[in-house]
Amino acid sequence: MYLAVTCSPTKGVDETMELSEKLIGRGFKVTPHIASKCVSGEKHLDRIIKKLDELGIESIFVPGGDRPEPMGDFNNALDLLRALKKLGHNLNKIGMAAHPEGHPDVSNEVLMEALEEKKDLADFIVTQMCFDAKILNDWMVEIHKKGIELPVWVGLPGVIERGRLLKTSLRIGVGDSLRFLRKKSQVATELMKSSIYNPDDLLKDITEQNDINQTNLAGYHIYCFNQIETTEKWRSDTISALI
């Protein structure tokens, strides 16, 4: 199991690397996020690569990042992935982001083109949260048909306060599936009687999709939103129930 160490648009990659080093010191495997907009250029990236080597980190995730404007030469994840290949590295696993339900600022056509351009520069995909299992299923089938054969880790929200989840989901552009979520009477009832969201029903819906097991589904990436204890308990309990 890897712990994802995200990259704050205000604190930057250096803070991500510092926290990664502390977690490694406590025995964890980490996947730091190297957000392209938070890297100033090739010299900065080269320093990051050297630090990754020093810490023995073998896995990173390359998103665009949440900065309004890039701090340097890399406008998007593709730019940084190309620079990584040019500079060379000892990484075994490089991840890229995907948005099954789209992105508020980018068309679906552009998103798919970007995936196709990045597929040879990355080793795995992590999706943004999606609350509509059918949309997720259809997207997984589509990328499989387009020859994108990378393993896909589907993003699931962890156990989190409902209000915080709704706020975050609307910010990152999963509003359509939230509207779908509200229409489902079983889930809506659950939300009404509890202020805490639990991903059990969503996980069940995903596993019941007809086609998803014929795609490159590798597993699940849990977005815990710093609700580590409750989410880890849910994860452990869910795995125990399957054994």
Where are these regions (language model features)?
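Active-site glycine-rich loop that binds ribose-phosphate moieties when present
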Residues: D105-D120, I125, I135
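Conserved, mostly hydrophobic/aromatic
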Residues: P32, K118-L121, V154, I206, ...
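Active-site pocket-lining/capping segments in soluble small-molecule metabolic enzymes
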Residues: D73-P100, G147-D211, N226, I239-I243
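Active-site glycine- and acidic-residue-rich loops that bind
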Residues: V39-K43, P68-N76, T127-M140, R162, ...
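Charge-patterned, long linear interaction tracts outside catalytic cores
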Residues: K118, N213, L217-K233
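Short catalytic-loop micro-motif centered on adjacent basic/acidic residues
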Residues: A4-T6, P32-I34, F124-M129, G219-I222
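Non-catalytic positions within long, well-ordered alpha-helices that form the structural scaffold/packing
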Residues: I24, D53, K118-K119, H144
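Active-site beta->alpha loop and helix N-cap motifs at the rims of alpha/beta catalytic domains
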Residues: M1-V110
